Amino acid sequence: IGVRLVGSEMCIRDSIMSYIDYAKQSPDAEVLFGGNGDKSVGYFVEPTVIQTTDPMFKSMVEEIFGPVITIYVYDDAKYEETLELCDRTSPYGLTGSIFARDRYAIDKAFNTLRYSAGNFYINDKPTGAVIAQQPFGGSRASGTNDKAGGPLNLIRWTNPRCIKECLVPPTSYGYPFLGEK
């Protein structure tokens, strides 16, 4: 009988495929891998890799929530300019990662992109947060940067303040440990 298709699942599949179809028809992009999703057999979409020459390409600036990644190859001589471009390209910032061996490149990327994603990884895969151990949920227009169950989510709903009560009133205004005479 097969999988029963729910309307929202088909909508998601159609949305993902619209990005892939857009890339297939664009002179600024090439589908390097995958790119298929046969509606007649279900809502499965193949993992897809798109390469673009336009850093503002649709699949670079919008969240897809599907098995699609878009690659933009930058000029090594324009590394710092490319980092700035990455920081301002999209209003979304769920998860991000950089891979590098050069300490200067890592430090520069970290300092430029430190607020670009809810979870930011250096030389590690961006697979998501450890549940209830680190905040997760994105930044910018991606989520709330915390999830229920974690301590930072609790802090989100609090208004911390400090209250001090002195039980032994001071007898002088000086500081004896400063050696005042």
Where are these regions (language model features)?
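Single conserved hydrophobic/aromatic residue that forms the stacking wall/gate
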Residues: 1-7, 11-12
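Short, hydrophobic secondary-structure boundary micro-motifs
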Residues: 4, 32-34, 166
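Helical element adjacent to the flavin cofactor pocket in flavoenzyme catalytic cores
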Residues: 19-23
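PLP-dependent aminotransferase class I/II
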Residues: 25-27, 77-78
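Short glycine/serine/threonine/alanine-rich loop segments
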Residues: 28-29, 118
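Conserved PLP cofactor-binding pocket of PLP-dependent enzymes
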Residues: 29-43
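Conserved C-terminal structural/oligomerization subdomain of aldehyde/semialdehyde dehydrogenase
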Residues: 37, 44-181
